[in-house]
């Protein structure tokens, strides 16, 4: 069976939801999270690899996680058997800051403890940078493809880094924030006028 074109490509899934549940409804957040999980499972089965930050898991007032990072970590950890035996490594490049160890959510501590000692994970420290933009630069250096889900200025910053390096940026069209920023803005830009390839 021929290998997928995704085999060995390193994917970086990034984004967030807004605090306002009237903008990012529970139903839309659930739909986005289910999509991200299914996407990670599919990529994993096709031999793809990942860049994932190690950070806190902040929740909205209604309990919805604001970011997708720990969903990606947990999905990979729970489905390692789906990965082709001959897939290239490392499976994950984990980008962390010296403060992050203490910020790992209790419910994902066992996931991190197992993954951080695995030969499937390469840890890249951004400990010398306190600025989020510098940590994003480290992430972008390792990724091949950026997939954006919601988000805001951070998503736009990462998208520029990937674009400037000639790497694909794939914005997903979920209603997780204002249309004027993040993946929604990128999606609208890509679909408008001469930017769209139909």
Model-inferred region functions:
Residues 3-10, 15-198:
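Acidic/glycine-enriched connector segments
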């Amino acid at each position: 069976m021929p290998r997928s074109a995704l085999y060995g490509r390193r994917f970086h899934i990034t984004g967030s939801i807004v605090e306002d549940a009237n903008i990012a409804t529970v139903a839309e957040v659930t739909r986005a999270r289910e999509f991200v999980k299914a996407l990670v499972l599919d990529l994993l089965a096709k031999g793809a690899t990942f860049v994932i930050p190690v950070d806190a898991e902040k929740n909205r007032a209604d309990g919805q996680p604001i970011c997708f990072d720990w969903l990606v970590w947990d999905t990979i950890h729970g489905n390692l058997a789906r990965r082709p035996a001959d897939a290239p490594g490392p499976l994950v490049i984990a980008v962390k800051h010296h403060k992050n160890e203490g910020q790992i959510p209790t419910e994902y501590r066992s996931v991190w403890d197992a993954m951080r000692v695995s030969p499937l994970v390469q840890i890249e420290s951004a400990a010398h940078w306190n600025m989020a933009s510098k940590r994003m630069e480290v992430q972008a250096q390792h990724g091949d493809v950026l997939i954006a889900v919601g988000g805001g200025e951070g998503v736009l910053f990462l998208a520029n880094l990937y674009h400037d390096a000639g790497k694909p940026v794939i914005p997903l069209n979920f209603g997780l924030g204002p249309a004027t920023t993040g993946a929604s803005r990128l999606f609208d830009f890509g679909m408008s006028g001469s930017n769209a390839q139909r």
